[in-house]
């Protein structure tokens, strides 16, 4: 059993990214082994007074779904007005079991759930900013209003939504940490290595849960 090393300071928040049925085994966009990180996330949650959860929440006709583009297959890439877009299998559709938070996730003190990807024509990876890089979720203001200047990020997937969230946190002036053993990656065509290059270049720091738990 893991024991707490110490309660994180009041200026720290835990951001839990997309720990949903759709991204865990049996889901429509399952990441291998993603359910295995949930016990660690639950333990980390007991160390923080401020916890934010993100939830992918797509309409059935979302622009990122390959099924909505004639002749396209999942994991093809298309160009949209805001840049390249990976096409995904339909996943985390609003109101479906696939979109629900994983039942093993146990974070009773979580204060805020941010639903993202609900705009039909814009994808959303980051907890802070939509993929068009103009539309804010309001999370940066929410955290700063509460005196938060440091965020620890966990969840799914390391190379997409976790990475975009961590980079945008750093851009927002927050100290940004990714807890590597509380995340799982898709790692598609070198995407994990590329994501870490981008994160480190943006000032994101990588740590282990052992830095918080013993």
UniProtKB/Swiss-Prot annotation:
The record, for InterPro entries, names: Isochorismatase-like_dom, Isochorismatase-like_sf, Isochorismatase_Nicotinamidase
| Cofactors | a divalent metal cation
Biological processes, Gene Ontology terms:
pyridine nucleotide biosynthetic process
- From the UniProt record, give the pathway where this protein acts: Cofactor biosynthesis; nicotinate biosynthesis; nicotinate from nicotinamide: step 1/1
MF-aspect GO terms: metal ion binding; nicotinamidase activity
Q: Which keywords fit this entry according to its UniProt record?
A: Hydrolase, Metal-binding, Pyridine nucleotide biosynthesis
**Superkingdom:** Bacteria
Say if the entry is tagged with keyword NADP.
Answer: no
Q: Which residues bind a divalent metal cation?
A: 56, 58, 62, 91
Catalysed reaction(s)?
nicotinamide + H2O = nicotinate + NH4(+)
Q: What is its EC number?
A: 3.5.1.19
State whether keyword Hydrolase applies: yes
Entry similarity comment: Belongs to the isochorismatase family.
Task: Provide the function of this protein.
Answer: Catalyzes the deamidation of nicotinamide (NAM) into nicotinate (Na). Functions in the deamidating salvage pathway for production of NAD from nicotinamide.
Q: What name has this protein been given in UniProt?
A: Nicotinamidase
């Amino acid at each position: 059993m893991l024991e707490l090393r110490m309660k994180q300071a009041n200026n720290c928040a835990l951001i839990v990214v997309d720990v949903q049925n759709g991204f865990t085994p049996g889901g429509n966009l399952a990441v291998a082994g993603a359910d295995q990180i949930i016990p660690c996330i639950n333990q980390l949650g007991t160390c923080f007074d401020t916890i934010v959860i993100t939830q992918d929440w797509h309409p059935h006709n979302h622009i990122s779904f390959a099924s909505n583009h004639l002749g396209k297959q999942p994991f093809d890439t298309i160009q949209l007005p805001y840049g390249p877009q990976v096409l995904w299998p339909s996943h985390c559709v609003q109101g479906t079991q696939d979109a629900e938070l994983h039942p093993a996730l146990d974070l009773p003190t979580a204060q805020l759930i941010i639903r993202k990807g609900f705009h039909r024509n814009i994808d959303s990876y980051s907890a802070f900013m939509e993929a068009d890089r103009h539309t804010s979720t309001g999370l940066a203001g929410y955290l700063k209003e509460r005196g938060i200047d440091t965020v620890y990020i966990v969840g799914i997937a390391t190379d997409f939504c976790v990475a975009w969230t961590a980079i945008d946190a750093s851009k927002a002036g927050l100290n940004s940490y990714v807890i590597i053993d509380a995340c799982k990656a898709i790692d598609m065509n070198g995407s994990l290595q590329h994501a870490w290059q981008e994160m480190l270049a943006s000032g994101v720091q990588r740590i282990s849960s052992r830095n918080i738990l013993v």
